[in-house]
Amino acid sequence: MVPEQAERHYRGEAGQRYHREKRAVPDAAIPWVARLRAEKLAPHLRPSDTILEYGAGLGWNLARLDCRRKLAFDLEDFLPPSIRAAGVQFVPDATAIAAATVDAAVCHHALEHIMQPAAALEEMRRLLRPDGKLLLFVPFERERKYRRFDPAEPHHHLYSWNVQTLGNLVQECGFRVAQAATGRFGYDRFAAVWAVKLRLGEPGFRALRRLLLTLKPAREVRLVATRP
């Protein structure tokens, strides 16, 4: 997926720490986040689909989806028991999956971490059946903080795209781009932590997240493509 030098951020204790400090939410909020992600992905999927998430992290994106088979690939196997219980199967090596056996590949805020994004997209294309879907999401990084270099920056992003350049990359990797746009995204972890602390429940989590997105909008690039 990435050369050893870049992998160090996501393996072993460093990987556990990265997910704990940058991605983890309180256990009580995992279903809230999982439902939010399912609402985002479900319109593109069918109950009969086999789906693979490439760079699945903690597995929230797949947990609440109604699909026949849910596969999660990442560099390290630390899916929470609750995610495994939701029927998500961890796959330690995506190259071991037979070609043309997946109906949809999800890559949600992972491509920007990968040293060779074109190679990752080509691997996803190999796994997809003809007319299979690629659901790709990356940050739309335009904030002031990105105008300078910070050697201690904690997110480890290696690339940044806009709608045009991401579409160009996906097209060059042999996909047909069906949709490409930006959309609101972010504050899931912050809203989850405070909703649990303040005992606001899932409605409070969603309301707090909407408020934050209104006050300080953050966006992502969203792209849907198919394999010819």
Residue map of PLM features:
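Conserved N-terminal segment of class I S-adenosyl-L-methionine
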Residues: M1-A98, A104-H108, L121, A181-G183, ...
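Helix-to-beta-strand junctions that scaffold the AdoMet/dcAdoMet cofactor pocket
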Residues: R46, I114-M115, L128-P130
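Short catalytic micro-motifs in class I SAM-dependent methyltransferases
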Residues: H109-H113
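Short glycine-centered segments of the SAM/dcSAM-binding site in methyltransferase folds
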Residues: T50, D131-K133
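Non-catalytic N-terminal targeting/anchoring module and adjacent flexible stem/linker
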Residues: M1, R227-P228
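S-adenosyl-L-methionine-dependent methyltransferase catalytic module, highlighting the catalytic core
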Residues: Q5, Y18, A24-A28, M115-E123, ...
